[in-house]
């Protein structure tokens, strides 16, 4: 267990290397969002017990929504951004809310990790931002339902240019260099 804990801490610290001191809260939240997506593939495989945990994300590089959410929460805490979990029982889904300035916003790292529509495989290195820094109203428009939150009412980031970008991320390049 101690070896896994050490490996996990090392992997978390590796992820944090993409954060630069001069970055704003939004930039930190985005670069860590992109890092997780660039280094993790979605899995719903029930045989993969780690899929529900940060170990699945940081050490196995495979996780489901709970694993992505737990990993993102750890990274947000490490960079001083308040974070909490949001879930929908009917969707059987989990994601985060983070606080930027004095406002809360939804972030669904899982749904921003693009999958090939034909064979449902991860599109390695591709990142979406449709579910990054969203109001509750926008989340409902992106097919999230059966969740309650009174906090995420600000629409400040709902129509930002990055919502329509689905591309190779900056962190993909760094992650690729680290792996090879």
Model-derived segments and spans:
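Non-catalytic ligand/cofactor/substrate-binding and regulatory segments of enzyme domains
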Residues: 1-9, 131-133, 144
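Alpha-helix capping and helix-loop boundary segments enriched in small/acidic/polar residues
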Residues: 3, 59-63, 87
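Extracellular adhesion/carbohydrate-binding repeat motifs centered on closely spaced tryptophans
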Residues: 88-90, 97, 155-156, 160-170
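Catalytic cores of secreted or luminal carbohydrate-active enzymes
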Residues: 150
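Conserved small/polar residues in nucleotide/adenosyl-binding loops
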Residues: 171-180
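Secondary-structure boundary elements
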Residues: 2-57
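Flexible, surface-exposed loop/gating regions in the mature catalytic domains
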Residues: 43-71, 75-78, 95
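Hydrophobic/aromatic-rich core segments of domains that either
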Residues: 67-139
């Amino acid at each position: 267990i101690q070896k896994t804990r050490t490996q996990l801490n090392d992997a978390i610290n590796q992820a944090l290397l993409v954060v630069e001191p001069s970055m704003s809260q939004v930039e930190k939240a985005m670069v860590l969002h992109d890092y997780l997506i660039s280094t993790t593939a979605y899995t719903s495989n029930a045989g993969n017990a780690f899929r529900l945990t940060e170990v699945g994300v940081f050490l196995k590089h495979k996780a489901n929504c709970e694993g992505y959410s737990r990993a993102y929460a750890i990274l947000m805490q490490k960079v001083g951004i308040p974070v909490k979990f949001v879930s929908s029982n009917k969707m059987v889904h989990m994601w985060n809310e983070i606080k930027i300035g004095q406002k809360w916003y939804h972030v669904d790292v899982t749904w921003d990790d693009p999958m090939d529509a034909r064979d449902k495989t991860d599109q390695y290195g591709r990142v979406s931002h449709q579910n990054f820094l969203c109001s509750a109203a926008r989340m409902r428009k992106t097919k999230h339902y059966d969740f309650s939150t009174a906090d995420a009412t600000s629409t400040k980031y709902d129509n930002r240019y990055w919502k329509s970008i689905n591309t190779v991320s900056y962190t993909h390049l760094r992650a690729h260099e680290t792996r090879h």
